[in-house]
Amino acid sequence: MSKIIGIDLGTTNSAVAVLEGGEAKIIPNPEGARTTPSVVGFKNGERQVGEVAKRAAITNPNTISSIKRHMGTNYKETIEGKDYSPQEISAIILQYLKSYAEDYLGETVDKAVITVPAYFNDAQRQATKDAGKIAGLEVERIINEPTAAALAYGMDKTETDQTILVFDLGGGTFDVSILELGDGVFEVHSTAGDNELGGDDFDKKIIDYLVAEFKKDNGIDLSQDKMALQRLKDAAEKAKKDLSGVTSTQISLPFITAGEAGPLHLEVTLTRAKFDELTHDLVERTIAPTRQALKDANLSASDIDQVILVGGSTRIPAVQETIKKELGKEPHKGVNPDEVVAMGAAIQGGVITGDVKDVVLLDVTPLSLGIETMGGVMTTLIERNTTIPTSKSQTFSTAADNQPAVDIHVLQGERPMAKDNKTLGRFQLADIPAAPRGIPQIEVSFDIDKNGIVTVRAKDLGTGKEQNIVIKSSSGLTDEEIEKMVQDAEANAEEDKKNKENAELRNNADQLVFTVDKTLKELEGKVEEEEVKKAEAARDELQEALKGEDFEAIKEKTESLNEIVQNLSVKLYEQAAAEQQAAGGAEGQEAPQNDDVVDAEFEEVNDDDKENK
């Protein structure tokens, strides 16, 4: 069975890992980094992904970041006149991760385990699966990020029973999960979180502070200047990271904008104390989900054996201090918070292929599922934190006499009223025989698979008539749309490959021109003038071709020039060999005389030595 890669598709950074020799290993990207910024840029019809796109963001307005925050919604990014869904942008990132994983492994990769925040709803999970499909990946499993982290942490600790709390504060989402580890079983007891809380929000607090300070000093609102805002964003992210290690950092942005008197510079010293003050409310927002997870698992803080930190934002000292205070124990620092999720996903891939044995993963659904019933109430069929896969059915009836159809409104959430919860989908069971209200028996069944994706079925028990719906992402992508996106992604991948090949061809041609110039100087006067002129003419033709975009012509002229230069070099070596041979023959004729002289001198030296003794 081919390898299944593990992908942590993050809000700000993504990572890919693979199981090798029973161990999960992070695959470095082409720049050598172990994580890749989840940033996509479009420039002159070309796509840039990762660090390259992030660096160019200051000058390139067609740059998209933190797209994960829009997964499962109807959000669209319009770039160069084309609309892109969050799935398509995510697919571009996944394609990039897939391509360098293939380069590393030396084989085609078409299967993956992709992680999502534990608190992602059904629409967001479905959107993630669609993104994988568009990128040319068969998503073998959608796994919760905290669960993946627990897998990576607990793989070598399966002999000991322990209860762990995974505190996952990433770039855009926050999750807390409580799991029990023992005898190779990883059982999730509860999960809670906030899909609108992450490192991006901490950055925004710094940006808002810098904008306010600059406006106070200079009367100019930098938030209206896109380029200045991107520079502020980069500076804020750097300052946040710096303040995890030092108590004060200098934010210096020269020529940030221009005023009436000329260019203006931003110079601000940000202390850790000020940063903690600015972000205090964000840190406080992590407490309620932590308490909720403990409550749902029927545990107290003292029952937790180990606290695992996941996500780059857990490096913030105030966050660590809050966890320590809330749970009464020092968090475990033996795992890399940026890498542990991808590694756990790779381990789950190994479980699927059979490379990892005796490991059972029991995950839960993060939110309750139900339908809308009379009075706009949500009737729950599956409670949150139910172990998945699972199924549940309940019988309902009609609300009016001779009601011909029943509308099924599928909901996900914890609020008592239907309107306050997330709509997953709607469908209708029609052709119900005329009968007084309360007589027809309509059975509604919910099924949740191992990926947390929901199927709902409604059946008229009287007639046996049935209707079902697989809940699709609320972005409303049809199978045809996904298929078209798959084809577009493949075409783009082919185009990207061709662009890369053309760039290499151009570079090789440039290098050849340089080499030819150097070689012709060395050959001056050593080969026939006619041969030199032939090489110069071919070189000039290649230089002319390099001015255009006809890559077939460049390839042809490169091959032609290469052949001429090789022939020149061969002639040069042949000439040199002939000269050496001629010189060697002349030496051979004089050799006997020289031998006599050397022998005579040698004899004399020995005689002298004998006399001296």
UniProtKB/Swiss-Prot annotation:
Biased composition (Low complexity): 577-591
Biased composition range(s): Acidic residues: 596-613
Induction pattern: By stress conditions e.g. heat shock.
Protein name per Swiss-Prot or TrEMBL: Chaperone protein DnaK
GO MF term list: ATP binding; ATP-dependent protein folding chaperone; unfolded protein binding
Sequence positions bearing Phosphothreonine: T173
Region (Disordered) residue spans: 577-613
Gene3D superfamilies: 1.20.1270.10, 3.30.420.40, Actin, Chain A, domain 4, Substrate Binding Domain Of DNAk, Chain A, domain 1
Keyword annotations from UniProtKB, A to Z: ATP-binding, Chaperone, Nucleotide-binding, Phosphoprotein, Stress response
PROSITE patterns in UniProt: HSP70_1 (PS00297), HSP70_2 (PS00329), HSP70_3 (PS01036)
Protein's job: Acts as a chaperone.
Assigned protein family: Belongs to the heat shock protein 70 family.
